[in-house]
């Protein structure tokens, strides 16, 4: 059973929007709704998303996550094959929670001021952007599908998952039933 008081606490929270630094080329992390550093420090690898040329494949079952395959994945549509400033984002009809750039041609001051980059063949998704990237290459909607699954770099990481338990029988975000 979730406590209704939790939503009251959430409503009173200070969202701490913004950044400590005025430039993306200097130190300082963004915090939004108590999500620490949603972009600008490292590229975040998004597992469960594979690209094969212009096609997007998504997987909702963590046990089936794999790279360079469509097995266990759903075709979520197509994306732009061009690099550039994002002009349009598409929503998948087969996975309505999935969105990805479908058109580039914007600028740093128009449409969505973040970039999309894509390579050909099998690719994986990084989002956000790393510290030290140019100011145009970091942002909440910055999509990078230029890298293969074998790529490794110190500016690529993943977000840890933290959740709290409230009451018996609460399910974790991955679906496991957890007894109190």
Task: Report residues per predicted region.
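Single conserved hydrophobic/aromatic residue that forms the stacking wall/gate
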Residues: 1-6, 10
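Active-site microenvironments of metalloenzymes and redox enzymes
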Residues: 7, 51, 65
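C-terminal, surface-exposed recognition/capping segments
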Residues: 14-15, 22-25, 38-51, 69-180
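Short, small/polar residue-rich loop motifs at catalytic or cofactor-binding pockets
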Residues: 28-30
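A short, polar/charged loop-to-alpha-helix boundary motif
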Residues: 52-62
